[in-house]
A protein has these predicted regions:
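Flexible, glycine-/basic-rich loop-and-beta segments that form/coincide
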Residues: 48-55, 159-164, 168, 374-394
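C-terminal catalytic and target-recognition region of SAM-dependent MTase-like enzymes
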Residues: 289-394
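Non-catalytic nucleic-acid substrate-recognition regions in nucleic-acid-modifying enzymes
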Residues: 2-139, 391-394
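Conserved S-adenosyl-L-methionine
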Residues: 175-295, 310-311, 317
């Protein structure tokens, strides 16, 4: 089976999370760059990466890399790539997207047009055709230019991998599923600890946490462009990967995951989303304000995405809101708080400085992932709690 260079775009600042996921799948990392991780893998790896990696935006198959500072060099570089190894005679191929950063060639539309012409020229010569029907499987191409280095890829995923298939209803400021999963995996939260999101919105943090706890693969209930690439990936590999994912699931696990919001309609939407994700039985959703956040359990986790106040009229409410977050957190003995927000004065109104602070881009918005660490349970206490939990489950 052929080995490919597979490129996994991810959120800037969270490459280490994606890298760990790829390692856990058993693959060798070949390159780590800002916002993407590259690894070596075969056709089966394409299936497994799409279905299992939680933090990936998509999985790209690298066709080639070369330098280009003129459109002639771009044309010749793309024409020199072995497109016939990937695209059959009836394949539908087009340049889905082109991006350019700090490069002499900067017009995406021109890059797309020239790249398509170069691909056609190559395939005309190889297949001895003057016209392509393009009525077969789709082969979308994505091209990236960075400092005059061109990376040419085929998109195996299709829709972005944050589209798990469960979120039909969204709140006003939704967090993508891939970012939520990556942030959860960045924390030390484990499934034996309570997790609460007091600003749950459409339920993304609680749902992703429940899927992690139950080991439900994020791509089990969606389709991918490369499923149609019968010339590269046997259909059986997709069936086998889904079967592997089903075997690894533990949907009967006992966890304590809770999501609150002050909007009853939003809470209803979160419940519906959780039901579609198959984890509604693992999450308790409730209409509740952050000021009412309290819990008798110790060593819990608050992981949340509070309002940022991106609109001017909302900014006036932020000092009071973040003061309430700080007061609620102060009453949670031994708990940890993990919070993503773009609000620059978050620490000031929460009333303490974060133990860690990581800059992350949520789309085009620069945000901060504040990490307030609670105390850890002693090993003796942890062992005793697990014994009690096992007895309760019997």
């Amino acid at each position: 089976m052929d080995t490919y260079e597979l490129v996994v775009p991810c959120h800037f600042g969270l490459e280490a999370v994606t890298k760990r996921e790829i390692y856990d799948l058993g693959y060798e990392i070949t390159r780590v760059e800002d916002g993407r991780v590259t690894f070596a893998g075969d056709a089966e790896a394409i299936c497994r990466a799409n279905i299992f990696i939680r933090s990936a935006e998509r999985v790209l198959l690298q066709v080639g890399r070369f330098r280009a500072t003129t459109f002639d060099e771009l044309f010749e570089g793309i024409k020199a790539l072995p497109w016939e190894d990937y695209i059959p005679k009836d394949g539908k191929f087009w340049v889905k997207k082109a991006s350019s950063i700090k490069s002499k060639l900067f017009s995406p539309s021109d890059i797309q047009s020239i790249a398509k012409k170069a691909m056609v020229e190559r395939l005309k010569n190889v297949y001895r055709l003057n016209w392509f029907p393009e009525d077969g499987a789709p082969y979308p191409v994505r091209i990236f230019l960075l400092k005059d280095e061109v990376m040419v890829t085929l998109d195996t995923s299709g829709d972005s991998l944050h589209k798990r298939g469960y979120r039909l209803m969204t709140s006003k400021a939704p967090l993508t599923e891939t970012l939520a999963a990556a942030l959860i995996m960045l924390t030390p939260w484990k499934k034996d600890r309570i997790l609460v999101d007091p600003f749950c919105g459409s339920g993304t943090f609680p749902i992703e946490a429940a899927m992690i706890a139950a080991n439900i693969a994020p791509g089990m209930n969606r389709q991918f462009t490369a499923e149609q690439w019968k010339n590269l990936i046997p259909k059986q590999l997709w069936y086998d990967t889904v079967e592997e994912a089903q075997d690894l699931m533990d949907a009967d696990i006992q966890v304590d995951i809770q999501g609150y919001d002050i909007d009853a309609e939003v809470v209803k939407a979160a419940r519906e989303n959780a039901k579609r994700a198959g984890v509604d039985h693992l999450i308790h959703f409730q209409k509740r304000a952050v000021a009412d956040l309290h819990h008798p359990k110790k060593y819990g986790f608050v992981i949340t995405n509070p309002p940022y106040g991106e609109r001017l009229e909302e900014k006036e409410d932020l000092p009071e809101l973040y003061t309430q977050i700080g007061q609620a957190y102060a009453g949670l003995d031994s708990w940890s708080l993990y919070m993503i927000t773009s609000y620059e004065d978050a620490e000031r109104y929460i009333g303490r400085k974060a133990d860690k602070n990581r800059k992350i881009y949520n789309g085009m918005i620069k945000t901060y992932f504040y990490q307030f660490m609670g105390s850890k349970p002693s090993k003796r206490r942890e062992a005793a709690e697990k014994t009690i939990e096992r007895k309760e489950q019997q």
